[in-house]
């Protein structure tokens, strides 16, 4: 005699097991939901933030920053969208001001290419300077890090001219062309190291030389590291201003041309913001302004008295805008050093900065003021430069 497959007791047991599964699943979901990070909830769009008083409202002039592919203008503590994100995989990034501050050159990055555009201060597109998109993905091109000469007549940028034998070796070189185009008149300045990323972030100097960041393969560590380089003219071999061990990049020259700010990592996972005296050809031993932060994109104030940069709050999180006072150039400069030198040449790093809504009390003469966190709930693009004009 066969027994029935389903009995009341067996059905009740299965129902109880199902209830336990559902309850445990919901419980785990709620537990992890209560303990998950709130970073995504904290980030707000700059235009949604009410104008602030405090240090950010006292920044002189106008700043341009990028968040989420949208270009924002910051004036007196108020953020205004200038170029809204095109949407999809496209984004605006890396603004560079005209010398008179009445317009910009910006990068539009798309899925497989990027181009340079001229826009006015209200965000109206005036001219597309490059046309790098191709029907064939392998022949797309990239243009990044635009920077205009002091008189605004020449545009410098990084560009990847494809190797016809090896289209997948995407490596950037420094180029220049007339500010209004056409690209057919572009001139190649540097020869990058293959398979490294190349030469980026050119800064034209009044002397006609160009400072840039070069990525190279370090045989000692078997890693790709960066150095600050200087080249006197197009096609000339560049000369290193920093050692490869220091892994320095993102150079920014002060308005007076006598100081250079940079981001250095020493090949580690954290960075320091450093400043060095610059005579147009060489750097003096640097001084650490901010240490143990993931600092990025240092940018000088129009009067050279301070530097803004991007860094997350603490060891992780979204990138906020910070400001730190910059020491004035000394009246008597030490002998120049051909490279940034060993770590012993640096000033003693300050403690890791503590976020603050207002500046800390005036420190002793042997210490510099702590950096001030100007924003707290935004999420700026750390790979995009900052533009600042009086």
Regions found by a protein language model. Name each.
Residues 3-390:
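Sequence signature of WD/YWTD-type beta-propeller architectures
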């Amino acid at each position: 005699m066969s027994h029935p497959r389903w009995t009341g007791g067996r059905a009740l047991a299965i129902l109880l097991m199902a209830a336990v599964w559902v309850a445990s699943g919901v419980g785990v979901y709620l537990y992890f939901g209560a303990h998950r990070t709130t970073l995504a909830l904290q980030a707000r769009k700059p235009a949604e933030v009410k104008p602030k008083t405090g240090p950010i409202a006292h920044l002189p002039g106008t700043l341009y920053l990028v968040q989420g592919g949208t270009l924002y203008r910051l004036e007196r503590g108020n953020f205004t969208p200038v170029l809204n994100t095109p949407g999809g995989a496209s984004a605006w990034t890396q603004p560079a001001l005209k010398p008179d501050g009445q317009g910009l050159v910006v990068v539009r990055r798309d899925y497989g290419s990027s181009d340079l555009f001229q826009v006015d201060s209200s965000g109206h597109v005036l001219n597309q300077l490059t046309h790098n998109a191709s029907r064939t993905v392998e022949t797309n091109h990239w243009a990044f890090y635009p920077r205009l000469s002091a008189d605004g007549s020449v545009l410098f940028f990084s560009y990847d001219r494809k190797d016809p034998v090896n289209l997948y070796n995407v490596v950037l070189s420094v180029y220049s062309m007339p500010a209004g185009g056409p690209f057919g008149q572009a001139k190649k300045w540097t020869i990058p190291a293959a398979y490294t990323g190349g030469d980026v972030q050119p800064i034209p100097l009044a002397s006609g030389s160009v400072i840039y960041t070069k990525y190279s393969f370090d045989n000692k560590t078997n890693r790709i590291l960066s150095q600050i380089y200087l080249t006197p003219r197009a096609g000339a071999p560049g000369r290193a201003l920093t050692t490869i061990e220091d892994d320095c990049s993102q150079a920014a020259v002060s308005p007076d041309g006598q100081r250079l700010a940079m981001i250095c990592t020493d090949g580690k996972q954290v960075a320091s913001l450093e400043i060095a005296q610059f005579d147009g050809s060489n750097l003096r031993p640097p001084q650490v302004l901010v240490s143990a932060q993931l600092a990025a994109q240092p940018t000088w104030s129009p009067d050279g008295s301070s530097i803004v940069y991007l860094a997350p709050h603490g060891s992780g999180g979204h990138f906020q805008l910070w400001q730190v006072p910059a020491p004035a150039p000394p009246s008597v400069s030490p002998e120049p050093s051909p490279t940034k030198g060993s770590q012993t040449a640096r000033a003693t790093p300050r403690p890791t900065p503590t976020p603050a809504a207002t500046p800390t009390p005036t420190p002793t003469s042997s210490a510099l003021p702590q950096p001030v966190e100007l924003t707290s709930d935004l999420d700026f693009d750390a790979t995009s430069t900052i533009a600042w004009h009086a």
